[in-house]
């Protein structure tokens, strides 16, 4: 996919879902609109590391004791969830994928890939990631993050470069358990409207 996959941290992640993690990699990109503020690290799997709404941090933050998957919000592409025995079966063919939660493969490959920024405005960011080995097909993934006055709109697109292939996509958010101080009764409304 890219040279980012050859670093020791990403190699470890491909072998063990719960590997120790050095924290966000590369430079962050910030988006702001109204009472919303978003921070994304393209080189850290296009992970949203911070989402602040009306002064409250909504996402779980990285700390030294965190494992690779345990903070922020990252895209799961080209598969979401678990592939049993790290095997993708398509028709009569079987494809082996990295078993990062042996014996299974979890959450795709996007979370340990470096993404490229292809468009950046004050309230919008579009990122691109090529798809390739160890995924058996060639393609690309586009992720668009847009802040509106009272919402974060996320979009993932998967494009093939030649033959069609099966794929799935989604996000893995780690929300904080408590907004603000323990004695405050502020509530967070999360509204998911899937478009499929």
What would you call each of these model-derived segments?
Residues 2-155, 164-169, 173-196:
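Surface-exposed acidic/polar loop and edge beta-strand patches at domain peripheries
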């Amino acid at each position: 996919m890219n040279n980012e996959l050859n670093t020791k941290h990403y190699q470890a992640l491909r072998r063990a879902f719960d590997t120790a993690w050095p924290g966000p990699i590369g430079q962050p990109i910030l988006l702001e609109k109204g009472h919303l503020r978003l921070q994304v690290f393209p080189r850290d799997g296009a992970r949203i590391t911070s989402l602040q709404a009306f002064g409250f941090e909504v996402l779980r933050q990285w700390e030294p004791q965190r494992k690779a998957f345990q903070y922020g919000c990252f895209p799961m592409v080209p598969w979401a969830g678990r592939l049993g025995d790290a095997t993708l079966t398509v028709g009569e063919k079987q494809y082996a994928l990295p078993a990062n939660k042996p014996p299974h493969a979890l959450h795709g490959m996007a979370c340990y890939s470096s993404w490229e920024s292809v468009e950046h405005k004050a309230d919008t960011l579009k990122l691109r990631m090529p798809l390739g080995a160890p995924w058996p097909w060639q393609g690309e993934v586009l992720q668009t993050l847009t802040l509106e006055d009272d919402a974060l709109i996320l979009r993932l697109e998967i494009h093939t470069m030649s033959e069609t292939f099966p794929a799935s996509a989604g996000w893995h958010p780690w929300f904080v358990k408590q907004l603000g101080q323990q004695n405050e009764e502020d509530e967070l409304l999360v509204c998911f409207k899937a478009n499929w």
